[in-house]
């Protein structure tokens, strides 16, 4: 049944719309009246060649699509649901080399190998080093007095965590930052002069060179673990490792840094929560920050056969877009979902991909990184205040902030609008 207040061609993945705001009210309307909604894209969709997609808005349905990898596949069209109009089908097909865009059995094999580097023990070994780095990041930024929170704070620890995990020299972290930005921000005018394909090629080449070096000189880092054969003879080839690093650079940098930025914006808008955090440092804060931010607004699957979802008939080959943003604010799952509550528990958000085979392999690393950097912010710049509005990334699927000017000392005049508990920044 069509939703009267939403035109059939209202495109929830429109990057221009998302530059200004997220479609919060429209998603809320769909959750109530048409939880699985067909979106017409009369002009066609770049890279896919179809004329629309199914948008899934309810928490339960998003989890069902995530769980049912037997009927909702990642391989046919990949996980990223929107590309620039000039994207070719051939370029989309190349994305299948990335773990995110694979189905079993290839996905099962690669994920088993990659999981070696993300065990609790492997992540735990990084904690002391990353805690020290988080403190240094916050202290360095605080000494500047004021600056761009994204560049000076929120991007730094995720980048350094990746560098530490992979054994990448810290001097090369800016390359990772640049490459990951250029690969994911093709629609944003700030990156209009870059070629995402070239950035991907440069990062893959860099990673393959790392793999070659570790094959000759093995160390204790994750690179060696992944390229050395286990007892079953399984290992990553150099090109498989290269594509894994592409995924890690995007997932580890873009999503975690955007969670950190949105989290600090939420604290600025909800000073009572910031005071609570500074006093108690609750472990539950990281998951609420991820829920609130939902840094990946949406991923997609493709129906592998005719299937019914939530009473709606979906045809084989149709794309099914999971709105993580909508699911994370589902009133049937979260009490007062539009209230930022760092003590929220339980918190079954889908910010790490819901459930199933594609659940975020680095979720524990992300939680640890978020906790460590906010502890460091609370220790070294407890009175931080915004002095400019956040500058959003133009993207149809990433909920990104490119720049945000703040006063680390708290001496400047705050300029983030909105009453506590509201969402004026369209996070």
Swiss-Prot record:
Gene Ontology biological process terms in this record: cholesterol catabolic process
Record-listed E.C. numbers: 1.14.15.29
Positions annotated to bind heme: 360
Induction field: By cholesterol.
Record carries keyword Oxidoreductase: yes
Domain of life (superkingdom): Bacteria
The protein's role, per its UniProt record: Involved in the utilization of cholesterol as the sole carbon and energy source by degrading the side chain. Primarily catalyzes the sequential oxidation of the terminal methyl of cholest-4-en-3-one into (25S)-26-hydroxycholest-4-en-3-one (alcohol), (25S)-26-oxocholest-4-en-3-one (aldehyde), to finally yield the carboxylic acid (25S)-3-oxocholest-4-en-26-oate. Also able to sequentially oxidize cholesterol itself, not only cholest-4-en-3-one.
Protein family (similarity comment): Belongs to the cytochrome P450 family.
Cited PANTHER family: BIOTIN BIOSYNTHESIS CYTOCHROME P450, P450, PUTATIVE (EUROFUNG)-RELATED
Protein's UniProt name: Steroid C26-monooxygenase
């Amino acid at each position: 049944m069509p939703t009267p207040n939403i035109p059939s061609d209202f495109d929830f993945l429109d990057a221009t719309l998302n530059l200004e705001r997220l479609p919060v009210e429209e998603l809320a309307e769909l959750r109530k009246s048409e939880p699985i909604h067909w979106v017409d894209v009369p002009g066609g969709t770049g890279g896919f060649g179809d004329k629309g997609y199914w948008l899934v808005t309810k928490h339960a349905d998003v989890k069902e699509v995530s769980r049912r990898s037997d009927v909702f596949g990642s391989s046919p069209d990949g996980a990223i649901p929107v590309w620039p109009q000039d994207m070719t089908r051939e370029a989309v097909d190349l994305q299948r080399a990335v773990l995110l865009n694979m189905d079993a059995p290839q996905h099962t094999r690669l994920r088993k190998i990659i999981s070696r580097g993300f065990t609790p023990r492997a992540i735990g070994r990084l904690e002391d080093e990353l805690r020290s780095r988080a403190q240094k990041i916050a202290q360095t930024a605080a000494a500047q007095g004021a600056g761009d929170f994204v560049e000076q704070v929120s991007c730094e620890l995720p980048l350094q965590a990746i560098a530490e995990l992979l054994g990448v020299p810290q001097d090369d972290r800016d390359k990772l930052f640049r490459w990951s930005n250029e690969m994911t921000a093709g629609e944003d005018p700030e990156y209009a002069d870059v070629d995402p394909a070239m950035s991907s090629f440069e990062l893959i080449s860099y990673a393959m060179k790392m793999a070659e070096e570790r094959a000759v000189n093995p160390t204790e880092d994750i690179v060696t673990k992944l390229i050395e054969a286990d007892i079953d003879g399984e290992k990553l080839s150099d090109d498989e490792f290269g594509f894994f690093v592409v995924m890690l650079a995007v997932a580890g940098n873009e999503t975690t840094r955007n969670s950190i930025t949105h989290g600090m914006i939420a604290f600025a808008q909800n000073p009572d929560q910031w005071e609570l955090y500074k006093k108690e440092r609750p472990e539950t804060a990281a998951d609420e920050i991820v829920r609130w931010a939902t840094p990946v607004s949406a991923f997609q699957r493709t129906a592998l056969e005719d299937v019914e979802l939530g009473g709606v008939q979906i045809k084989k080959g149709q794309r099914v877009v999971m709105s993580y943003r909508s699911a994370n604010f589902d009133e049937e799952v979260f009490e007062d979902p539009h209230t930022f509550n760092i003590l929220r528990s339980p918190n079954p958000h889908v910010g790490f991909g819901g459930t199933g085979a594609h659940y975020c392999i680095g979720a524990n690393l992300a939680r640890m990184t978020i906790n460590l950097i906010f502890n460091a912010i609370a220790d070294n710049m407890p009175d931080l205040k915004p002095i400019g509005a956040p500058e959003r990334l133009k993207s149809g699927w990433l909920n990104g902030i490119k720049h945000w000017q703040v006063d680390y000392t708290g001496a400047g005049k705050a300029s983030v609008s909105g009453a506590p508990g509201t969402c004026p920044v369209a996070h």
